[in-house]
């Protein structure tokens, strides 16, 4: 059976390893998962209370248009319901966008170190992928702008960026958008929007009134603590959302997921507390790094990236201590956990870097 030639160059997405997978390698003890940027505190208690009442609905198909959820999102964001598209996580929405917009021979432009699904789906659609290196961990919009051409159908901007946690500020993003043709779709992936505390972070939704080629993505998987429910959404011009809905699978968001997301979206107190605790957790890591001269990227997310050597060694050390982190070729990404979990990881990092310094001194004195 023949499939697309380009699939031979791709691999299925590999998420962070589960505790069960880790036990097969590192033994049967407990593991703390800090690899996939989930909320360690779970979701709003309102969600749990309400879902207890919903078990009898499961024999019925969900609302295919996610009407209540979309209206809830629209009301809070001050847009029309027709401007909102819901999907089974942002992964599905990225797939929908790629399938709807891209043709063989087109190209997309994005960063070299960013969420890999932009590249993945472009290749499936037979497109060229132009990847621009980050500048000190941040999207280099000037360089991205310089390679956009008539065949560029999508520019993907992950802001804040995954895996570095860095962000493009309001001035730079606005300037970039002004310089891009309206024939090119600019997708701004704001999966970590709720965690942002920077005063100059862009408010992108007002830009939709002026620019027809902008699509903003957000999710319930991170701050809202609903990763297993798989709910993400896009906000854009009505005409574009209407076309994307043609590609969307019917009944793509389950009834439980719709109800959970609708309830969670109304619990601002929960989000405020999550952001407060997350900010304290980031400060734990940043203080440790500064005190020990360990490089890191200041983060506007619920994770921190350390651009260090020997990521595999650090991953192994954390794994043996019961912590699952995410290694990269040029560093490690650690999800912010509870205070105690953060302290545990920091203790492992402290030991690793002390051993590294000791080994370096021994080699110099040999």
Where are these regions (language model features)?
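N-terminal small-domain helix-loop-helix segment of the aminotransferase-like
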Residues: 2-89, 96, 366
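Short beta-strand
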Residues: 33, 295-299, 325-327
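PLP-dependent aminotransferase class I/II
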Residues: 65, 213-290, 294-297
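PLP-dependent aminotransferase-like
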Residues: 100-157
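Active-site pre-lysine segment of PLP-dependent enzymes
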Residues: 123, 141-150, 163-186, 192-221
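Hydrophobic residues in beta-strands of the RecA-like P-loop NTPase core, especially within AAA+ ATPase
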Residues: 157, 188-189
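Conserved PLP-binding catalytic core of the aspartate aminotransferase-like
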Residues: 279, 287-321, 336
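PLP-dependent enzyme catalytic core of the Aspartate aminotransferase-like
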Residues: 312, 317-321, 325-366
């Amino acid at each position: 059976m023949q499939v697309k030639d380009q699939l031979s160059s791709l691999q299925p997405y590999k998420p962070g390893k589960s505790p069960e997978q880790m036990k097969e390698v590192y033994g049967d003890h407990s593991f703390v998962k800090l690899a996939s940027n989930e909320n360690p505190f779970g979701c709003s208690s309102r969600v749990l209370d309400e879902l207890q009442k919903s078990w009898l609905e499961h024999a019925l198909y969900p609302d295919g248009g996610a009407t209540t959820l979309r209206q809830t999102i629209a009301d809070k964001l001050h847009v029309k319901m027709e401007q909102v598209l819901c999907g089974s996580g942002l992964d599905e929405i990225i797939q929908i966008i790629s399938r709807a917009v891209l043709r063989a021979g087109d190209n997309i432009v994005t960063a070299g170190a960013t969420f890999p699904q932009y590249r993945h789906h472009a290749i499936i659609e037979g497109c060229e992928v132009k990847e621009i290196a980050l500048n000190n961990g941040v999207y280099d919009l000037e360089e991205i702008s310089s390679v956009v051409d008539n065949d560029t159908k999508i520019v993907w901007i992950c802001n804040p960026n995954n895996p570095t946690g860095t962000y493009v500020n309001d001035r730079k993003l606005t300037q970039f958008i002004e310089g891009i043709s309206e024939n090119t779709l600019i997708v701004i992936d704001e999966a970590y929007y709720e965690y942002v505390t920077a005063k100059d972070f862009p408010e992108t939704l007002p830009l939709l009134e002026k620019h027809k080629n902008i699509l903003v993505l957000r999710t319930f998987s991170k701050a809202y603590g609903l990763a297993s429910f798989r709910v993400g959404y896009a906000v854009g011009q009505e005409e574009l959302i209407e076309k994307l809905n043609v590609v969307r699978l019917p009944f793509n968001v389950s009834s439980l997921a719709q109800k959970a997301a609708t309830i969670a979206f109304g619990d601002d107190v929960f989000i405020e507390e999550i952001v407060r605790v997350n900010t304290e957790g980031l400060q734990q890591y940043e203080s440790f790094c500064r005190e020990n001269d360990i490089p890191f990227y200041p983060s506007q997310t619920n994770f921190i990236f350390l651009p260090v050597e020997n990521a595999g060694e650090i991953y192994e050390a954390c794994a043996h201590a019961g912590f699952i982190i995410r290694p990269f070729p040029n560093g490690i990404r650690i999800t912010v956990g509870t205070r105690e979990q953060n302290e545990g990881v920091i203790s492992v990092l402290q030991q690793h870097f002390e051993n590294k310094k000791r080994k370096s001194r021994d080699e110099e004195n040999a």
